[in-house]
């Protein structure tokens, strides 16, 4: 059985206190389901920066991810968070180039590339997000957009050490989900552009009801999950319902 990589992206949700409540609830679920979880998945949550410390020393095999990081190592960059700060909190993964960062904070492929390069130097695993808008999808430009984003974001990087998350923008938080075949086709294309060894996730309204069919696809190695990861019971159901 190939284990899937499940990363819950909490976005700007939850507080330090509610994160501790999540951990307590997940601890109870883990005691019942740990064998299944660990057989089927590697699992992590990307909490807001302020909540990472609440999960730092968990003994549940629950890995930590950050939602962004700076491409500067340290210095007078108010509001930025460095790779070393993340490492000190036992963070394993960092999400880069999420469509919401691109939309609201003018994130560019070039900056994603600089961040990913630094992450790899620091032994953090970057999760580089790519995906098309609804307009681009309807115009048949999905692969064209994804190819351009990957070319710039992964320039001169070891693609076998980078995780790529395909998140069609039209499916993020909308309740719309790409069909399993669409997701499979694009994830397969990403592997063709990068490497068969590159881990490719799908993200976009993934939940416990559709994850079985999606996880049955040959080239989908995991999932970047939003709202369905905020509650411990929902997060648990994701792993239990994997193929």
Swiss-Prot record:
Belongs to the triosephosphate isomerase family. Homodimer. Its main location: cytoplasm. NCBIfam families: tim. This is Triosephosphate isomerase. It comes from Mycoplasmopsis synoviae (strain 53) (Mycoplasma synoviae). It is found in: Cytoplasm. Pathway: Carbohydrate biosynthesis; gluconeogenesis; Carbohydrate degradation; glycolysis; D-glyceraldehyde 3-phosphate from glycerone phosphate: step 1/1.
